[in-house]
Amino acid sequence: MLKSISILFLAIIMAACSTTPEKKVMIILVDGVPADVLESVDTPILDQIAAQGGYTRAYQGGGKDEYTQTPTISAPGYMNMITGVWGNKHNVWGNSVRNPNYNYWSIFRTVKTVNPEMTTAIFSSWEDNRTKLVGEGKPEAGNFMFDHSFDGFELDTIAFPHTTDRSFMFNIDENVSKGAADYVRTNAPNLSWVYLEFTDDMGHMYGDSPQMIEAVKGMDNQVGRIWAAIQQREREFDEDWMVVITTDHGRSEDTGKGHGGQSERERTTWIVTNQNSLNERFENNPPVVDVAASALRFLNIEAPTEIREEMDGIPFIGDVSIMNAKARIVGNELAVSWDVADKSGSVEIYQSSTNNFAKGEKDEYSLLGKAEVKEGQFKTAFTFPTGTTKLLLKAPHNWTNVWVIVE
C-alpha cells in the first residue's frame, strides 16, 4: 500500500513538473520568387520543411480591381505580411515607404503588447524593414523595439563593396542567414523575421534565367542554416517552432525582370510551412496577410479587439469558420456572403459608418443581424451613407471584415 502511494505521489510530482513546449515562430521572406520558378527548381530544404507541413500557392496584391488592391512591389508586400492588412489600411505603396499608417500594428508590436515577456528579433538584408516598415522606436508605432536586430549591412560598403553584378547582396544574405542561425541556437526568440534579397536582384537583372535558378538554390541553402538551428532547438530544448517561408511578389509575364502590376504571375506567390494543422484556408490560395494571423494563433496571442477587427488575414492553421467575405449593394439591400469552412454556429454581422481607426481613433460597431454559418450569406435592408461602410463578421472560430464604398 505504501509503495502504491509512493508511486502515485511520484507520478503526480512528475506531471506537475512537465511543461508545455514554448512556442516560437520564424518567418522568412525571400524576395521576388514567383511560384512557377520555385516549383521548377530543386529546393531540398524547402521540400523537407513542406514535407512536415505543407506547400501552397498563395497571392499578393490584395483584391484585383478592388479597394484592397496593393502594388506587387517589395515594401508593400512585406507590410502586407507583417501587419495582416492590405495597402488601403497600412498605406505603403512603394519602396520609399513615405507615410505608413502605424495604427495598423505589426505582428511584433502586437506580440510585445499582449505578452511583454516574449522576445522578438529581425535579421534583414534591408534595414528599412526595421526602421520604416516596423517603425522601430517611433512614437507613432508605439515606441516598439526589437529585442535583437541584425541588419544594415547594405550600408557597409567596406565589408560589402558594392559591385555591378550585385554579388555583394548574396554575401549579405549569407551573413544574415548565418547571423539568424547563430542567434536562434543561443537565444531562440519567440518571434523572428528573416529577409533575404538576392533572388530579386537576379530577377531584375536577368529575368527568367539560369542566374535566377542559381539564386533560388542559394536561398534554399541559406534557409537550411536557419532550419538546422531550429531543429537543434527542438531536439535540445522544450520548444515548438512554427516556420513560414514566403515571398513578396511574383514577376512579370514576359521576361520576369519586372513586377508591380496585377498580372496573374506577378500576384501568384507561395507559402511553405512546417505546420501540420493546416486548414481549408491553406488549401485554397491563401493571401499573404494570413501569415500574421496564423503566427498569432500559433503563439496563443489574441490581438487587442480594435486590431483584430481590422485584420484582413485569417489563420491557415487550426479551426476556421468563414473566409473570403464579400459585400455588395442589391437595390436597397446589403448582401453579405462568405465561404464556409466549418458549418457549425452562427455569424454576427456588425457595421460601422466611420473609419476613425485609420486616424488612431475608435469606430463604433452596431449589430445588423445574425445568420447561420452554413447559409453562407446574409441580407438586410440598409441605407448606405456616402463613403466607407465597414462590415465585421464574427464567427465561432474567426473574425473577418469587408468594406462597402459608396462614392
Regions found by a protein language model. Give the residues of each.
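Metal-dependent active-site segment of extracytoplasmic phospho-/sulfohydrolases and closely related
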Residues: I27, I45, G218-G260, A295
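Short, structured active-site-proximal loop/turn typified by the sulfatase FGly-forming signature C/S-X-P-X-R
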Residues: D36-I73, A121
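Substrate-binding rim/cap in mid-to-C-terminal beta-strand-loop elements of soluble/periplasmic
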Residues: G77-Y78, I82-V85, G260-I301
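Catalytic-site neighborhoods of secreted/periplasmic enzymes
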Residues: N88, V92-W93, N99-T164
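Active-site His/acidic residue clusters
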Residues: G135-K138, F150, K178-N221, R225
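Histidine-centered active-site microenvironments of extracellular/periplasmic hydrolases
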Residues: I245-N274, V404-V406
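Polar, surface-exposed loop/tail segments
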Residues: P286, L299-E333
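Aromatic/hydrophobic beta-strand junction motif of beta-rich domains
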Residues: E333-D342
